[in-house]
Every structure is written in C-alpha cells, then in structure tokens.
C-alpha cells in the first residue's frame, strides 16, 4: 500500500456499455496516456508495466498497439466511445462517462484508498520554485488549510489530516496554476475557492 497526504487512485476504466450486459466478443482496445504523463508514469509503475532492463534502465512496456491520448478528458471520451476500450485516469476525474474497475474486489473510492482496500494510489504533488512571493505563499497556505482540504475532499481526493483554519487573506492578485491534466481541475477549484 502506498501512503501519501493527498492521494489519487489510478482507476482503470472501461466504457459503460459492456457493464450493462453488452457484447464481450470484441478485441480490447488499450488506451494510454502520452510519454511524460504523470498518470501514465504512476500506472506503469503501480501495475508493473515498467521494468528494468539488463543495464538497470527503466523500460515502459506499454503495448505499441495502444492508442495514445494527451489528456484526461480525451482518455475518458475515447474509452466512453468504444465499448471494447480500457484506459486509466485519476479517481478524482471519474464521472458518469466511464466506470472504474474493482481492484481485488474493492470499489474505486476515496474511502477505500484511505482504508487500504483499494491498493492503487499515488500522491499528488504541488511544486513551486524557491522564494515564493507573499501572494503565492498565501495561496499555498490556503491549499494546506482546513478550507483548502475541504475542496480537495469535496472533489473526490483524499485530504491532508490535521490541518488548521486558513488565516490569510487573498490579495486579489492573479493566481496562475499549470501542470498535469489530472491535477489542473482540482487546482482550478482550489483557485476559485481561494479567490472568492
């Protein structure tokens, strides 16, 4: 089991049509993320798709037949549009368009990641440069506060425990967030809540 403060589940997904008793006779279409995707990196590591070669270098053994998508929403729409497709996304990105597969009988949920019964998870990381401005530090303080972590929890992710109330004050300065297509929707919600 992997433990982290803020965690996402990497839920393998498949389209809903087969779950409702659809046709199971087609060839499975493997849908993967692009090289460099943090979601892909976590998936290949957690599921043993990545191995070391004789030189000790990591090798990604994703099938060459995989259809590559460049972000979470494209992954979801591609899987949803093909009843034979299977792919992977972050649990917090899951919606009614696709469904998550059980792992060892456990449903993909924040509760099951937290209690250890859903064993596939990874941390979300926020990185900054050294010497944050006062405004950027205030936003980070908000993210790590009880208020910010409520946004994290409400969005389906696992919040950091033992947080304190936010005591800063948003200056109204422009907040810019960038990065992974898995993390960006959550960061945008945090930004929106912070700047209210």
Task: Give names to the regions the model predicted.
Residues 1-196:
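Exported/periplasmic ABC-transporter solute-binding proteins
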């Amino acid at each position: 089991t992997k433990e982290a403060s803020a965690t996402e589940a990497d839920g393998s997904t498949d389209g809903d049509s087969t779950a409702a008793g659809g046709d199971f006779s087609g060839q499975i279409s493997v849908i993967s993320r692009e090289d460099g995707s943090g979601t892909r990196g976590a998936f290949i590591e957690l599921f043993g798709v990545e191995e070391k070669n004789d030189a000790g270098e990591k090798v990604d053994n994703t099938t060459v037949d995989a259809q590559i998508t460049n972000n979470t929403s494209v992954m979801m729409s591609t899987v949803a549009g093909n009843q034979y497709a299977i792919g992977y996304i972050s649990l917090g990105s899951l919606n009614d368009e696709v469904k998550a597969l059980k792992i060892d009988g456990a449903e993909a949920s924040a509760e099951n990641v937290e209690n250890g019964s859903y064993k596939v998870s990874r941390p979300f990381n926020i990185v900054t440069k050294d010497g944050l401005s006062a405004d950027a530090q205030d936003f980070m303080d908000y993210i790590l506060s009880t208020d910010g972590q409520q946004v994290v929890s409400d969005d389906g992710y696992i919040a950091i425990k033992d947080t304190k109330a936010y005591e800063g004050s948003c200056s109204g300065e422009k907040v810019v967030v960038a990065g992974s297509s898995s993390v960006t929707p959550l960061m945008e919600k945090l930004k929106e809540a912070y700047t209210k």
